[in-house]
Amino acid sequence: MDSPATSGSLTVSFSPHSGDAFPVGLPVLSAAPVESIFAGAVPCGHSGDFALFRDGPWLLGRARVAPGSDLAQTSAQLYGQLLDAARGWHLARIWNYVPAINASTSGGLEHYRAFSQGRALAFERVFGPDFKRAVPAASAVGCDATE
């Protein structure tokens, strides 16, 4: 079987008309280079680095930050902002795109592990030592993006 044709980088958008589209550093595997999810979402503000959107009962957020030199600290800060923005909401799902996910940090820790440490610290700060009960489904997808 032939592999799918790729062209450029996949771009994700909550709504085709909201102007929030952003490249995620993944190859395009279909004819559509822009993936619109929650196509009815409308912008409803900002919180820290997050742009926020509403689609019916759903609160959606998107943040894009350069990882900097300390990925654990950056992910802890960003997840802290996410948890602040989502206070009073039940988090159902979080998607993360982590550049060079299997590469090592300057301290020798794999990017994914550093990202996960920061994420866990943010949840523990908000929910305490029993934070695992509050963690939603999540994914960390490796990508070629530099931020």
Listing of model-derived features with the role each one plays in the protein:
Residues 1-147:
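Short, polar/acidic, helix-capping and beta-turn segments at strand->helix junctions
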